[in-house]
């Protein structure tokens, strides 16, 4: 893939690796309550990485690409920590599911540039439901899904790029903010 001037937009990376460990556990504490947890701890690296940044003069005339050798860098969109906890309550027709997820810092380029990164975040969702047995149709379940229970401000995606204009590096970052506290209601009819 190429830009209008002919330089590459993306490149294959010959020396990279992902290594880590994934853990998960679940425990039924009582017939009506269970606890689950998971975590992924990883290293996501590029060896001998060179970043290529488009360079322009002060009048935005294209001068070429500047090579910036970074050595070992971090793969984009690859947090080193992802973890979650799940609490599941269910008594007769009532159910409650509380899920908290933590996602570590992510870069959205391979350049390990803090100006082009996503902050870590932790978000909690709650699902509540009640199911009634209905003799003629099977069952009816009423549910409420409460997303972002603690009203966390976070972005879970973004993109960006760097350029050098008139000898000064400029980093342009764009983010996708996620919804604050919100509620969805639902009804499920089973035949």
What is each of the regions a protein language model found here?
Residues 71-74, 114, 170-174:
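Short, P/G- and charge-enriched loop/turn segments at secondary-structure junctions
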């Amino acid at each position: 893939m190429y830009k209008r001037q002919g330089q590459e937009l993306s490149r294959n990376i010959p020396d990279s690796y992902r290594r880590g460990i994934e853990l998960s556990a679940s425990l039924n504490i009582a017939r009506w309550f269970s606890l689950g947890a998971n975590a992924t701890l990883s290293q996501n690296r590029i060896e001998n990485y060179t970043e290529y940044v488009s360079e322009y003069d002060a009048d935005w005339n294209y001068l070429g690409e500047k090579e910036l050798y970074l050595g070992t860098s971090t793969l984009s969109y690859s947090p080193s920590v992802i973890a979650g906890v799940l609490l599941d309550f269910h008594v007769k027709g009532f159910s409650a599911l509380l899920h908290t997820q933590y996602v570590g810092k992510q870069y959205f380029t391979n350049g390990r540039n803090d100006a082009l990164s996503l902050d870590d975040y932790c978000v909690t969702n709650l699902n509540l439901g009640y199911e009634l047995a209905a003799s003629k149709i099977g069952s009816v379940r009423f549910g409420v899904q409460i997303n972002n229970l603690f009203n966390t401000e976070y972005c879970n995606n973004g993109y960006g790029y760097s350029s050098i204009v008139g000898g000064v590096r400029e980093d342009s970052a764009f983010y996708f903010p996620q919804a604050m506290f919100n509620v969805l209601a639902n009804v499920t009819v089973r035949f």
